[in-house]
Amino acid sequence: MSPRLRLQPEAVGIGMTSQRVRDRLVDRLREAGIVDESTLNAIRVVPRHLFIDEALASRAYEDTALPIGHGQTISQPWVVARMTEAVLQVAPKRVLEVGTGSGYQAAVLGALGLEVYTVERIGDLLRQARKRFRALGMNIRTKHDDGRVGWAEHGPFDAIVVTAAAPALVDVLIEQLAEGGRLVAPVGGPSAQSLVQLDRRADGSIEQHVLAPVTFVPLLSGMLD
């Protein structure tokens, strides 16, 4: 699976946002255990510097989370890559993301040619993400809503990616997962979280295991404009 993103010249970047800098990030991710080449290529292609404030652009290709306002962050590239790599293992076509945030995770999935649906509870963040998707020519379906309820009318989904942590996996989201599908989500409280992978088998059974320790902002209910 190869990235399908056609970038405008301004997305290519110069200096601290150049292709050479992105290649170094990909090398670090590979050294940190990311092995799926499609995932690494998507990380290389998607311009992370366009998903953060211009003042932080020089840090865009560091392997670290960065603030995006409203108490939210753009996830660490390793975490984005690990979640992407995990869901690609089930060869999904339709993916639900809970928590659009900056839009970066959705863009990585979209660059891989997946049909992406993403839900965000904070209206201002979603409006900014939509502008980025349009600028990159990405056809990502977006919705301003409480992410904890998912997007049932477009389900079931082959994969679900949750980008904020809840004390336990959300049953409503599990119900929107197709047979043979995979959900990846951070689970835990402020002091300790784990990235959990849940698989719904063809016989309807559920199997889950922990991928890695992580740190995410909390998954909140309700909506903000």
Curated annotation (Swiss-Prot):
Catalyzed reactions per annotation:
[protein]-L-isoaspartate + S-adenosyl-L-methionine = [protein]-L-isoaspartate alpha-methyl ester + S-adenosyl-L-homocysteine
Write out the GO cellular component annotations: cytoplasm
Provide the alphabetized UniProt keywords: Cytoplasm, Methyltransferase, S-adenosyl-L-methionine, Transferase
Localization per record? Cytoplasm
Question: Catalytic center at which residues?
Answer: S75
The keyword Repeat is assigned to this record: no
MF-aspect GO terms: protein-L-isoaspartate (D-aspartate) O-methyltransferase activity
Enumerate the CDD domains for this protein. Answer: AdoMet_MTases
Q: Name one Pfam family in it.
A: PCMT
Which example biological process does GO assign this protein?
A: protein repair
**Transmembrane regions:** none
User: Which superkingdom heads the taxonomic lineage of this protein's source?
Assistant: Bacteria
Enzyme Commission numbers on file: 2.1.1.77
Give the UniProt family note.
Belongs to the methyltransferase superfamily. L-isoaspartyl/D-aspartyl protein methyltransferase family.
Q: Read off the HAMAP family from this record.
A: PIMT
| Function summary | Catalyzes the methyl esterification of L-isoaspartyl residues in peptides and proteins that result from spontaneous decomposition of normal L-aspartyl and L-asparaginyl residues. It plays a role in the repair and/or degradation of damaged proteins.
What protein does this entry describe?
A: Protein-L-isoaspartate O-methyltransferase
Organism (species): Stenotrophomonas maltophilia (strain R551-3)
Q: What is the lineage of its organism?
A: Bacteria, Pseudomonadati, Pseudomonadota, Gammaproteobacteria, Lysobacterales
- The gene designation is pcm
